[in-house]
């Protein structure tokens, strides 16, 4: 009887956060802060063009924010990822402006905080170009993941451009 009451009490008190599966294989977790973590799933990555230097993919993502209150859907995002061992980049439109982010996986002039804040870009790039596991690993060991895939990027720090 007490076992049944304990199970019932647990079931009735379970929050939406407990009911969700935070270990879903298709999710890639990016930046985590005090209010939770950014996550995404790849809905589409369509090859647009391949050259000697790399491959351009048109991407569509489903984005989320996970916290103690549960996982909130943040909608879909479209963009482009240029998979290149020498010029890795991400492009997207935000508020009517085109934004480009050039990755510097071996940055020598970038603070640890800056690298941490760019975790979403790193996760997205490596997940599209090398698979979800590489994206997940890049959040915690960007240089190691880039090195394991033969990257040789000369940028001393990551760069963002808006037009």
Where are these regions (language model features)?
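N-terminal signal peptide c-region/cleavage motif recognized by signal peptidases
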Residues: 14-16
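N-terminal secretory-pathway/extracellular module detecting exported/lumenal segments
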Residues: 20-163
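Bacterial N-terminal signal peptides that target proteins for export
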Residues: 1-5
């Amino acid at each position: 009887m007490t076992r049944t009451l304990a199970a019932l009490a647990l079931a009735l008190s379970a929050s939406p956060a407990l009911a969700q599966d935070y270990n879903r294989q298709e999710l890639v977790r990016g930046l985590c802060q005090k209010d939770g973590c950014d996550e995404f799933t790849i809905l589409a990555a369509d090859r647009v063009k391949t050259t000697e230097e790399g491959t351009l993919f048109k991407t569509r993502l489903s984005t989320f924010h996970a916290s103690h209150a549960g996982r909130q859907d943040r909608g879909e995002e479209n963009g482009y990822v240029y998979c290149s061992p020498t010029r890795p980049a991400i492009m997207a439109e935000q508020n009517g402006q085109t934004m480009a982010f050039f990755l510097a996986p071996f940055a020598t002039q970038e603070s640890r905080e800056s690298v941490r804040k760019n975790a979403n870009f790193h996760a997205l790039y490596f997940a599209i170009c090398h698979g979800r596991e590489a994206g997940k690993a890049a959040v915690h060991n960007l240089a190691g993941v880039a090195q394991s895939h033969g990257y040789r990027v000369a940028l001393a720090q990551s760069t963002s451009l808006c037009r």
